[in-house]
UniProtKB/Swiss-Prot annotation:
GO cellular component, one term: cytosolic small ribosomal subunit
Molecular function terms, GO-annotated: structural constituent of ribosome
Recorded superkingdom: Eukaryota
UniProt keyword terms in alphabetical order: Cytoplasm, Ribonucleoprotein, Ribosomal protein
GO process annotations (BP): maintenance of translational fidelity; maturation of SSU-rRNA; ribosomal small subunit assembly; ribosomal small subunit biogenesis
InterPro entries in the record: Ribosomal_eL30-like_sf, Ribosomal_eL8/eL30/eS12/Gad45, Ribosomal_eS12, Ribosomal_eS12_CS
Pfam family, one: Ribosomal_L7Ae
Subunit structure, as described in the record: Component of the small ribosomal subunit. Mature ribosomes consist of a small (40S) and a large (60S) subunit. The 40S subunit contains about 32 different proteins and 1 molecule of RNA (18S). The 60S subunit contains 45 different proteins and 3 molecules of RNA (25S, 5.8S and 5S).
Organism of provenance: Candida albicans (strain SC5314 / ATCC MYA-2876)
Taxonomy of the source species: Eukaryota, Fungi, Dikarya, Ascomycota, Saccharomycotina
Subcellular location: Cytoplasm
PROSITE patterns linked to this entry: RIBOSOMAL_S12E
Protein's UniProt name: Small ribosomal subunit protein eS12
């Protein structure tokens, strides 16, 4: 009986360590994957700008390494409209954002192959409520 009690204590400690170690990028990755499953992602500049102008967006993720400066200005302007400001996160790598948004092929081991870069991704539907979503919302409320 004492073995079972010790195992439960160890599991509780592990859960506490994992919840405290989640970074914004890890939370963003999980939120994008959940939103993709629930058909709530707008991937690419055309779909993202439509969702932003219709005010359907909950969150916008923009790539910093875009070569065209007008793309960055357009997305930032659509996110910062005075009626309703949409949270904006900037990511450094387009290929990484494309992989998170599902713009890739997966091999048998689950590794991403043939990743296509994404300049902008918009979350229109969060999907399921999760701890990662709450972490992102707390991050935006602090800013």
């Amino acid at each position: 009986m004492s073995d079972v009690e010790q195992e439960q204590i160890v599991e509780e400690v592990v859960v506490e360590e994992q919840s405290g170690a989640i970074t914004i990028e890890d939370a963003l990755k999980v939120v994008l994957r959940t939103s993709l499953v629930h058909d709530g992602l707008a991937r690419g500049l055309r779909e993202a700008s439509k969702a932003l102008s219709k005010r359907e967006a909950q969150l916008c993720v923009l790539c910093d390494s875009v070569t065209e400066e007008s793309i960055i200005k357009l997305v930032e302007a659509l996110c910062n409209e005075p009626e309703e400001k949409i949270p904006l996160i900037k990511v450094s790598d387009a290929k990484l954002l494309g992989e998170w948004a599902g713009l890739c092929q997966l091999d048998r081991d689950g590794n991403a192959r043939k990743v296509v870069g994404a300049s902008c991704v918009v979350v229109k539907n969060w999907g399921a409520d999760s701890d990662e979503r709450n972490i992102l919302l707390e991050h935006f409320s602090q800013q």
